[in-house]
Amino acid sequence: MSTASPAMSPFSPRRPACVLCLLAAVLLVLSPGLARADDSMAGDAPAHPGPRAQLSGALRPADIRRAAARVAAWQYARVQDHDSLDWTYAPLYLGFLSAADLLHEPRYADYVRKVGEHYDWGLGPRVHHADDQAVAQAWLVLYARTPDPAMLKPLRERYDAQLRIPDDPQRPLWWWCDALFMAPPTWAGLAKATHESAYLDYMDRQWWITSALLYDPVEYLYSRDASYLHQHERNGEKLFWSRGNGWVMAGLARVLSLMPNDYPQRPRYLQQFHEMAARLAQLQGKDGLWRAGLLDAAAYPRPETSGSAFIVYALAWGVHHGVLDAAAYRSAINRGWRGLVGEIYADGRLGDIQPIGAAPGDYPPGASYVYGVGAFLLAAGEVEAISEAKPR
């Protein structure tokens, strides 16, 4: 935080404190991912997290499951008596559902179901806000396993009302790139569950409105939001946030997994997925992980685990489902997974997860937050599916 000079003190007559307080409050309310994600259970950053676990990062099923089990058990112990509809928990719920299958541990899926039932399968309070729709991804996964119309009722009611709002490319509904993970898979998932294409068509229109605003057709990367379109790193390169692009890659993977193969717009999603995958593979660090700022790695010496985990998840999903060429991406996935496993502490904490934010930043090695753990568990499931002992 900068220090104001006496002449420009926040409490001087030229800058009344009440005006600044009001401005700060407005910015806090308007900023997605910052205003509501104040849940102390979402994570922490201890100064002394203890020793690393020194687990094997080999792409062998037993080693992958061992790493996933260590992380899942640690996180479960911290949240098992807690529930939330906050966006920070959406990746964790998805990760727990994946871990339940990978590890044959029903307690993880039972926990997610308990949360959904507690909230009557509802969503967050902001009706049209992507962050407050994200948890529905987990409800839709559970619905696919045990269909019950009551599980879809809150989502359908909210989305049917939203369908009646005209599109406005000048005021994008999903105006920050993280939103492409939060909301689109819920729309695609609801379309699949109900066999009603209107939900998918709506998602498709909104996706490309956001893409037109934030996607760089030269760098094949997304700016976090329009305020970052002309910001640069210290080395002069454009500023692209690794977790923001990880959100998008994971969102693409999840949308493609739910979208019919014959959907007319599917080739556009595949093209963007291929473009981003190739570019991100070029930017991978020597340790297998990505830095918080993608185009100025030297400015960010620590790896960033949450963005890296989302990227590894998306790449592994692409290989698993024949969307990406295994020969071209297996090395990047292998190195990425080894790097992620190296971030596990002896007690199961997953470190180097950047706290909630909107741009590259600093954090201590032990920083751990639920969205990063969820991304890691999602990656574990897809990496295990293409591991050395699996038929290909």
Regions found by a protein language model. Give the residues of each.
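Bacterial N-terminal signal peptides
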Residues: 19-31
